[in-house]
């Protein structure tokens, strides 16, 4: 009897081992999950302008003050009626949209894998329409950099960037698109309108 029980136990162990081995090989041979990239939705063209009922000199002075004190923008310079400024932005996904990788925001994916940086270069142009009114126009150029790979996207308020990546996900297009979410532009032009 004990020999029969031993044989029965050996059969059960053997069946268990074969089943586990089969499951292991079955899962090991399954296809790896592929990364999928989804392009961002196109943003409509926005005209970031404002007409302020003040002369060009006083509004230019107020804008410089706004940029340096309220927004902490660095490297402010003025040439004639054009003001330039630069700011390094944290939280990239608040300002730019480069689509999605799987279910993750692409710029967050890049930052998690490679680390990244985002710089915004501002150009504010003033044009006197008459003695007491000034037209203000704003354009922002962005530079988004994947720090480890050095991949760089350069785009502006209304002009998206399209780059080719060296190693795209298998079966995916090697093209990536980045565009402004217009967050910074809308915030800044709103503050300028309130001057």
Give names to the regions the model predicted:
Residues 7-8, 16, 137:
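Intrinsic disorder/low-complexity detector
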Residues 16-27:
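Bacterial N-terminal signal peptides
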Residues 9-12, 28, 34:
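Generic detector of low-complexity/intrinsically disordered segments
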Residues 30-195:
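Ser/Thr-rich, low-complexity intrinsically disordered terminal regions
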Residues 1-11:
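N-terminal secretory signal peptides that target proteins for export/translocation
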